[in-house]
Swiss-Prot record:
Primary gene name: CIPK9
Binding-site positions, ATP: L25, G26, E27, G28, S29, F30, A31, K32, V33, K48
Ranges where the record places region PPI: 343-372
Subunit text: Interacts with CBL2 and CBL3.
EC number(s) stated in the UniProt entry for this protein: 2.7.11.1
UniProt modified residues of type Phosphoserine: S164
Protein name: CBL-interacting serine/threonine-protein kinase 9
Lineage: Eukaryota, Viridiplantae, Streptophyta, Embryophyta, Tracheophyta
GO biological process entries: cellular response to potassium ion starvation; potassium ion homeostasis; regulation of potassium ion transport; response to cold; response to mannitol; response to salt stress; response to wounding; signal transduction
UniProt keyword terms in alphabetical order: ATP-binding, Cytoplasm, Kinase, Manganese, Nucleotide-binding, Nucleus, Phosphoprotein, Serine/threonine-protein kinase, Transferase
Organism name: Arabidopsis thaliana
Length: 447
């Protein structure tokens, strides 16, 4: 390998239990999510990795163990399934169903607000999930669009049930600092921090989500946090004129600042607007064959229950074989067009040298207001200004696919997804000289 390039094939892969872990799918301040493949069954999964020391230090063991055990027993079509739980000396691994249809938020960012019937359909699926988990004694406490993902068939699934308490608990400033950095979806009683009913608080968050789906913007959105808190606590908002009377009635009953008089899920299920086109979920809830022994083992201090993390060299294959054999790195995804909407991550190809690509990215990012830190063939960019969800931060890495072909991967590591969309549009415009236009190359070959 020359000094100016990195190979696309990693030096090693981490293997935990039966799972070989791949690239990072998402990253937060308390957990990282990685793509994984079960080497025995071939099944794909997502693995959420928690810091074991943080869990024990913040005395979250019993609550997490109880809620994860309950969630492992839940097999609902609108809830991301927990498959198994493992632990090493330093990490807790929660193996989750891989849902690869993208966030519901991305659909809004791409299309704008949804039509009322489509918004209602997603809202019905959200309420199905929340109602079922509440019936099992598990509350989400941090519902927002980032927790709502779509499967390949467009079915809504809710993620992070049973884990949100930990995400807030480990922050120094407590409840107000939710995973997205703002309290826009949080109920007034949660903001007041006087103790609250988890069911009523989740219903409020569902109401904010419904408003966003139908309006395309938040009902409560102020740059000044104190002003925002006051508006939320007084439920100061107005519905846009395109909302139907039925939708307005439901949203106003949900966004009721008093949790005692707020509409319950039982009442919501009887509402005429909600019932339009409603199809109750059909599924088997047979948990006789499901064991939670792995959850107990993961949170125990027994060394016998720990899995080992192994670094293994991958099977030797050329880069195009690697790309073609994995749905995560399909050629269709690899050579995506510039105009296509990006989500939390994207990649492009270039026939320029790695050093030239690095220089061009640095040169393009700085005028956009980003601080740039380089490390070999990785770049970390952080915005100077704080947006709706803190400073936007982006990680990039250059890989060599062939001597004259590189892949550049960009991933949002912090900040707002919509701001990342805007950043990528400007960033890719500045990089047009180094991005390989595969359509043009194909035309040249035909001639």
């Amino acid at each position: 390998m020359s000094g100016s390039r990195r190979k696309a094939t990693p030096a090693s892969r981490t293997r935990v239990g039966n799972y070989e872990m791949g690239r990072t799918l998402g990253e937060g301040s308390f957990a990282k999510v990685k793509y994984a493949k079960n080497t025995v069954t071939g099944d794909q999964a997502a693995i959420k990795i928690l810091d074991r020391e943080k869990v024990f230090r913040h005395k979250m063991v019993e609550q997490l163990k109880r809620e994860i055990s309950t969630m492992k027993l839940i097999k609902h079509p609108n809830v991301v399934e927990i498959i198994e739980v493992m632990a090493s000396k330093t990490k807790i691994y929660i193996v989750l169903e891989l849902v690869n249809g993208g966030e519901l938020f991305d659909k809004i960012a791409q299309q704008g607000r949804l039509k009322e019937d489509e918004a209602r359909r997603y809202f019905q699926q959200l309420i199905n999930a929340v109602d079922y988990c509440h019936s099992r004694g598990v509350y989400h406490r941090d519902l927002k669009p980032e927790n709502l993902i779509l499967d390949a068939n467009g079915v809504l699934k809710v993620s992070d049930f049973g884990l949100s308490a930990f995400s807030r608990q480990v922050r120094e400033d407590g409840l107000l600092h939710t995973a997205c950095g703002t309290p826009n979806y949080v109920a007034p009683e949660v903001l007041s921090d006087k103790g609250y009913d988890g069911a009523a608080a989740d219903v409020w968050s569902c109401g904010v989500i419904l408003f966003v789906l139908m309006a395309g913007y938040l009902p409560f959105d102020e740059p000044n946090l104190m002003t925002l808190y006051k508006r939320i606590c007084k439920a100061e908002f107005s519905c846009p004129p395109w909302f139907s009377q039925g939708a307005k009635r439901v949203i106003k009953r949900i966004l009721e600042p008093n949790p005692i008089t707020r509409i319950s899920i039982a009442e919501l299920l009887e509402d005429e607007w909600f019932k339009k086109g409603y199809k109750p979920p059909s599924f088997d809830q047979d948990d006789e064959d499901i064991t939670i022994d792995d959850v107990d083992a993961a949170f125990s201090n027994s060394k016998e229950c720990l899995v080992t993390e192994k670094k293994e060299k991958p099977v030797s294959m050329n880069a195009f074989e690697l790309i073609s054999s994995s749905s995560e790195f399909s050629l269709e995804n690899l050579f995506e067009k510039q105009a296509q909407l990006v989500k939390k991550e994207t990649r492009f190809t270039s026939q320029r040298s790695a050093s030239e690509i690095m220089s061009k990215m640095e040169e393009t990012a700085k005028p956009l207001g980003f601080n740039v830190r380089k490390d070999n063939y990785k770049i970390k960019m952080k915005g100077d200004k704080s947006g709706r969800k803190g400073q936007l931060s982006v990680a990039t890495e250059v890989f060599e696919v062939a001597p004259s072909l590189h892949v550049v991967e960009l991933r949002k590591t912090g900040g707002d997804t919509l701001e990342f969309h805007k950043f990528y549009k400007n960033f890719s415009s500045g990089l047009k000289d180094v991005v390989w236009n595969t359509d043009a190359a194909a035309e040249e070959q035909k001639q």
